[in-house]
């Protein structure tokens, strides 16, 4: 991999290699684009097979956060940290203290958060060394469990997708097939049940599914059968890459809208959904409630303000469909274009020099 060629192709700003011999830290911090503001993205710890694989993951995930933050309407760029190591046995306090100091050394260009392989407790240790971290324990001023907020955003986005598909955003009487009933999906089911939707659920953990059956009157189907049920809306809320060559042929819905990340196995599957007449709410737009919620911590967390911002996911999804029609492209590409247009607009707006420019990390001091 020619790193500088790759960074130039996709407009990356910075790649920081961090090591600490005493703690065993080997980490990579990626900063993609900071046109909108400081880069925000989680910290992932994984048993990468090689350093190159870790670098590629940091670059891919960092760029993804640029699009997610921009599409969510946040004044934040995109970034990511990856740590090479086994989260089950390689963690220690010194490792996260050292990494916190590296992040502090970036002086606010990058803000970290919890991700795969890291925990709230790890973020608390990072917080000992830097203020450029979100998702810490509530005792340090965090927002707490983000699942209800994320779920509300998915619910609002689903209503927007229903409006596009059916001409009306009401979910009353609609049949919604929910794949996975974890923390976010459970809260989503609550909203859907309260509006009068009929729920069909599945989960590899039968206890999760049984809870939805008991509390919301949902119908249970085996995990392998969820793609075959007759429904109005299919809500993927578990693993990624579940929209693929095999499953698209089986889907019997008019809308795909759920909380799972990376729902399309390949980009071409977004085009295949369109060709089948299925309205697709792009995953990183509809599930942005979590990042919106955690970003609000940078202002001094206010639940009412965060929920109002999350409510706007409805309009973001409608705008995606508007761009798709305007440009004659599938909705997954329209989401990218919406993010890119916002970044380009702000790049032009911010071309004027300011000695002391306001941004999210100094907002309350200006």
UniProtKB/Swiss-Prot annotation:
Optimum pH is 10.0-10.5 for the oxidative deamination of L-leucine, L-isoleucine and L-valine. Pathway: Amino-acid degradation; L-leucine degradation; 4-methyl-2-oxopentanoate from L-leucine (dehydrogenase route): step 1/1. Thermostable. Retains full activity on incubation for 10 minutes at 65 degrees Celsius, but loses about 75% of the activity at 75 degrees Celsius. Its EC number is 1.4.1.9. The keyword Mitochondrion does not apply. The active site is at residue 80. InterPro entries: Aminoacid_DH-like_N_sf, Glu/Leu/Phe/Val/Trp_DH, Glu/Leu/Phe/Val/Trp_DH_C, Glu/Leu/Phe/Val/Trp_DH_dimer, Glu/Leu/Phe/Val_DH_AS, Glu/Phe/Leu/Val/Trp_DH_bac/arc, NAD(P)-bd_dom_sf. Inhibited by pyridoxal phosphate. Belongs to the Glu/Leu/Phe/Val dehydrogenases family. Catalyzes the reversible deamination of L-leucine to 4-methyl-2-oxopentanoate. Exhibits the highest activity with L-leucine as substrate, but can also use other L-amino acids such as L-isoleucine, L-valine and L-2-aminovaleric acid. All of the oxo analogs of the amino acid substrates serve as good substrates for the reverse reaction. This is Leucine dehydrogenase. It comes from Thermoactinomyces intermedius. The gene is ldh.
């Amino acid at each position: 991999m020619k790193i500088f060629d790759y960074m130039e192709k996709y407009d990356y700003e910075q790649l920081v290699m961090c090591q600490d011999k005493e703690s065993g830290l080997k980490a990579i911090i990626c900063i993609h684009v900071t046109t909108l503001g400081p880069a925000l993205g989680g910290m992932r710890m994984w048993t990468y097979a090689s350093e190159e694989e870790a670098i590629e993951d940091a670059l891919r995930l960092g760029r993804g956060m640029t699009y997610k933050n921009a599409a969510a309407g946040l004044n934040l760029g995109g970034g990511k940290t990856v740590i090479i190591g086994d989260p089950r046995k390689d963690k220690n306090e010194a490792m996260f203290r050292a990494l916190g100091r590296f992040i502090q050394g970036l002086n606010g260009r990058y803000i970290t958060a919890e991700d795969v392989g890291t925990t709230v407790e790890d973020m608390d240790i990072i917080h000992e060394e830097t203020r450029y971290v979100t998702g810490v324990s509530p005792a340090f001023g965090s927002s707490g469990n983000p699942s209800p907020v994320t779920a509300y955003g998915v619910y609002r986005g689903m209503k927007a997708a229903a409006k596009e598909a059916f001409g009306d955003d009401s979910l009353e009487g609609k049949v919604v097939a929910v794949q996975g009933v974890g923390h976010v999906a459970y809260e989503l089911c609550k909203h859907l049940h309260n509006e009068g939707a009929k729920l069909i659920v599945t989960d590899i953990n039968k206890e999760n599914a049984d809870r939805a059956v008991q509390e919301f009157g949902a119908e249970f189907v085996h995990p392998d059968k969820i793609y075959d049920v007759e429904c109005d809306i299919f809500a993927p809320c578990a693993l990624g890459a579940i929209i693929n060559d095999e499953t698209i042929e089986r889907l019997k819905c008019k809308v795909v809208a759920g909380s799972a990340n990376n729902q399309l196995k390949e980009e071409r599957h977004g085009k295949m959904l369109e060709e089948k007449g299925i309205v697709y709410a792009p995953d990183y737009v509809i599930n942005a409630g979590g990042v919106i919620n955690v970003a609000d911590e940078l202002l001094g967390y206010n639940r009412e303000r965060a929920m109002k911002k999350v409510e706007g996911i409805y309009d973001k999804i409608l705008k995606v469909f508007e761009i798709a029609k305007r440009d004659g492209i599938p909705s997954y590409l329209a989401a990218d274009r919406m993010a890119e247009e916002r970044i380009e607009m702000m790049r032009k707006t911010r071309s004027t020099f300011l000695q002391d420019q306001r941004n999210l990390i100094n907002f309350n001091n200006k």
